[in-house]
């Protein structure tokens, strides 16, 4: 079935195809049908949360939380929506998504296009899904980098009562200077302030919601060690490793490989697994790792678990392989 759907979708511009898929999943979420009902439970506990299985939807697929119920019916053990910013923004000019067909990769320079945090919250409230929901937050492009904390605090305060956990995205390559927040004092200042905000919100709402940091796969070994120290020092609850890459080594010479933006999909797999392995050595079990980036098979997912990940997230591979990949991973990944 999916090969026919894929053929139709791939006749469209990548972003138009994505929007059509979201609208289709939105409709699917309102039907009585589900692809998840025959799946066995493979429960695991991470960050004090119980996941029905370790396979999650990565942020970026459903930026505005429009199709939560539809994605849930594909069999995911958890869903992460966003990245969302304090106010709506258009993102970068189109075209901004490019398929690297030969490598099953995608380059995007979306730039956090979204309808704003308030719209996302309304969509979350409408959803019937009652599983683990992560909300991924970012900064507006017009906010100076020195005022980034303001945007993250605004989003954290608004999404806190509606999320199972909150992910702080400081690793998109498509928002100017955003990745500079991953380093040294800038990272420490951000994490210190957000942990203080988390403590206040925990008291206000009578419940603790884990705080997760999403990092880039392009960090050096020294930078990974520094990030790990900051994560432990500030008692961050988990880390997502990782975001898209600026490297083109795995797709050099292929059509559209020279397009600006972050590369995801199969070509990212080895780099993200290496990041997980290095992080795992540095963290030594002090906080969990959520493996994301390039998962395209049971083997590639299991390699990330074996490298130190406790949970997995995917998105790009579904574009090439369809939703059956989710069910394969749920059935066969061993924690």
UniProtKB/Swiss-Prot annotation:
It is an enzyme of class 1 (oxidoreductase). It catalyses: (S)-dihydroorotate + a quinone = orotate + a quinol. GO terms for molecular function: dihydroorotate dehydrogenase (quinone) activity. The keyword Membrane applies. The active site is at 172 (nucleophile). Substrate binds at residues 63, 108-112, 169, 174, 243-244. Its main location: membrane. Keywords: Cell membrane, Flavoprotein, FMN, Membrane, Oxidoreductase, Pyrimidine biosynthesis. Its EC number is 1.3.5.2. Its cofactor is FMN. One of its GO terms (cellular component) is plasma membrane. It is found in: Cell membrane. Monomer. Belongs to the dihydroorotate dehydrogenase family. Type 2 subfamily. This is Dihydroorotate dehydrogenase (quinone). It comes from Glaesserella parasuis serovar 5 (strain SH0165).
């Amino acid at each position: 079935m999916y090969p026919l759907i894929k053929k139709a979708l791939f006749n469209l511009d990548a972003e138009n195809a994505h929007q059509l898929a979201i609208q289709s999943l939105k409709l699917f979420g309102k039907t009585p049908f589900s692809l998840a009902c025959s799946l066995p439970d493979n429960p695991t506990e991470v960050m004090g949360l119980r996941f029905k299985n370790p396979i999650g939807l990565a942020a970026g697929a459903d930026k505005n939380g429009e199709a939560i119920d539809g994605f849930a019916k594909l069999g995911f053990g958890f869903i992460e929506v966003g990245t969302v910013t304090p106010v709506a923004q258009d993102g970068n000019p189109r075209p901004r998504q490019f398929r690297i067909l030969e490598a099953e990769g995608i380059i995007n320079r979306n730039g956090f296009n979204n309808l704003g945090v308030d719209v996302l919250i309304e969509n979350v409230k409408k959803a019937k899904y009652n599983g683990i929901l992560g909300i991924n937050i970012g900064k507006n492009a017009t906010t100076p980098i020195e005022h980034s904390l303001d945007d993250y605090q605004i989003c954290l305060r608004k999404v806190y009562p509606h999320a199972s956990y909150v992910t702080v995205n400081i690793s998109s390559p498509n928002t100017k200077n955003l990745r500079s927040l991953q380093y040294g004092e800038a990272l420490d200042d951000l994490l210190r302030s957000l942990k203080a905000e988390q403590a206040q919100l925990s008291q206000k709402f009578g419940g603790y919601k884990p705080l997760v940091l999403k990092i880039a796969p392009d960090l050096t070994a020294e930078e990974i060690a520094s990030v790990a120290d900051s994560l432990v020092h500030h008692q961050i609850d988990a880390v997502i490793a990782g975001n898209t890459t600026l490297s083109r080594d795995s797709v050099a010479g292929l059509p559209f490989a020279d397009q600006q933006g972050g590369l995801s999909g199969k070509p990212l797999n080895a780099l993200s697994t290496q990041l997980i392995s290095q992080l795992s050595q540095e963290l030594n079990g002090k906080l969990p790792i959520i493996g994301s980036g390039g998962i395209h098979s049971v083997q590639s997912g299991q390699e990330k678990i074996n490298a130190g990940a406790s949970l997995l997230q995917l998105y790009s591979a579904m574009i090439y392989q369809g939703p059956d990949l989710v069910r394969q991973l749920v059935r066969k990944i061993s924690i």
